[in-house]
Amino acid sequence: MARIFDPAKSTLALRRRKRFLLSQLKIYPDSLRASLVERFSQCGKANCHCHQGGDKHGPFYYLTQCLAVGTINKFLLKAPAQQQAARQAIEHYHQLQERLEELSQINAELLRREHSLAGD
């Protein structure tokens, strides 16, 4: 979640923070808007321990995304390296999203104060 800035900050402080955010904006090529979901499930064998009250099979890790049609399970990530790469890519996306949200809040406050957004 993006940090809410202090609206009592001076316009100069907001512009400095904006310049800093812009200098820190980095779009990682592996950014990924998705979730990594851990699932446990029952198999299709009626006499398996998972149907007799035992532990379910898993964990299985799925990459999921919310699209216009709903939440989609993209695919199963079997290798630990795939799972770690997905976690890192999702974190990169969240970092970018947080910085953009803070930048948007600063711009909204500058507009409210009737200041130009250009030239920062």
State where each predicted segment sits.
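A positively charged, amphipathic N-terminal helix/segment that binds anionic biomolecules
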Residues: M1-D120
